[in-house]
Amino acid sequence: MTRHGKNCTAGAVYTYHEKKKDTAASGYGTQNIRLSRDAVKDFDCCCLSLQPCHDPVVTPDGYLYEREAILEYILHQKREIARQVKAYEKQRGARREEQKELQRAAAQDQVRGFLEKEAAIVSRPLNPFMPKAATLPNTEGEQPGPSVGPVGKDKDKALPSFWIPSLTPEAKATKLEKPSRTVTCPMSGKPLRMSDLTSVRFTQLDDSVDRVGLITRSERYVCAVTRDSLSNATPCAVLRPSGAVVTLECVEKLIRKDMVDPVNGDTLTERDIIVLQRGGTGFAGSGVKLQAEMSRPVMQA
């Protein structure tokens, strides 16, 4: 696993640096990496395709998606849920049939045992001059017991064994849990419906630039009210009635005073102001988690 003995400066102590390096090289244990700016998506990119959105929509939690991508995801989840429900119902029906078969077999065993006990009884004429306690001794030395009763204690303590054919455990199929019928958001994990999606309209910095030329620019969109440039360093919000994207500074200083959408004049509520989840700038102070972890098997002595 390690290369401690192969290093030219190998010492008697396995250092912490060597342990971390060998852990990263071997793939065992939890792997950690600090994400750089190249690994952070832009604020106007889809959370599924990681590409700039052509027809963007936003969820109530502020996650931006391409309409085609999120609708395809929802349809895929519904088909997957239908498949899981079908498999669950099939296994459930098979288990019911198995339980019924076991109950029928147990009932047949009880009837068979009762008939065998009844057939073994020998009728003898009663002698009125002999007391009832004077009966014939049991030739087999067994105590009389009920014809149908619980299994003996020695049978209860029988453990499964792989080398005795009669005690070999049965290989059973994995029990399926009842699947949830709710489609969830791929980012937040909360329930998501098509009616919860809100269309987003970004205001372009230059209306004369086509879509291809717009993608190549670092600053593509501006605030719909203040015309400030939007980026990962600028907290943004989406107004639900109009779908316009504005800065949070504009929301706090201008929009919250009257709670009126400055684009179409509709009345706003707190639910209509959706804070957009931005990708971050790559700096630790941007408020975005930049530490990625992946759990791997652990090698223990």
Curated annotation (Swiss-Prot):
Catalytic activity, as annotated: S-ubiquitinyl-[E2 ubiquitin-conjugating enzyme]-L-cysteine + [acceptor protein]-L-lysine = [E2 ubiquitin-conjugating enzyme]-L-cysteine + N(6)-ubiquitinyl-[acceptor protein]-L-lysine
Pathway-wise, it operates in: Protein modification; protein ubiquitination
Q: Please state what the protein is called.
A: Nitric oxide synthase-interacting protein
SUPFAM superfamilies on file: RING/U-box
What is the first-listed, main subcellular location in coarse terms?
cytoplasm
Q: Which Gene3D superfamilies match?
A: Zinc/RING finger domain, C3HC4 (zinc finger)
Free-text comment on this protein's domains from its UniProt entry: The U-box-like region is a truncated U-box domain. It is unknown whether it is functional or not.
Q: Where, by residue number, is the motif Nuclear localization signal?
A: 78-101
A GO term, aspect molecular function: ubiquitin protein ligase activity
- Which family does the record assign? Belongs to the NOSIP family.
Q: What does this protein do?
A: E3 ubiquitin-protein ligase that is essential for proper development of the forebrain, the eye and the face. Catalyzes monoubiquitination of serine/threonine-protein phosphatase 2A (PP2A) catalytic subunit PPP2CA/PPP2CB. Negatively regulates nitric oxide production by inducing NOS1 and NOS3 translocation to actin cytoskeleton and inhibiting their enzymatic activity.
Segment forming the signal sequence: none
Question: Quaternary structure?
Answer: Interacts with NOS1 and NOS3. Interacts with PP2A holoenzyme, containing PPP2CA, PPP2CB, PPP2R1A and PPP2R2A subunits.
Q: What positions are modified (Phosphoserine)?
A: S36
Q: Which Pfam families match?
A: zf-NOSIP (PF15906)
Q: Which cellular component, as a GO term, is one annotated location?
A: cytoplasm
| Biological source species | Mus musculus
- Please cite one Gene Ontology biological process associated with this protein: regulation of nitric oxide biosynthetic process
Region Disordered, annotated ranges: 131-154
Q: Which UniProt keywords apply?
A: Cytoplasm, Developmental protein, Nucleus, Phosphoprotein, Transferase, Ubl conjugation pathway
- Region feature U-box-like, mapped onto this chain: 55-75
The Enzyme Commission number assigned here is: 2.3.2.27
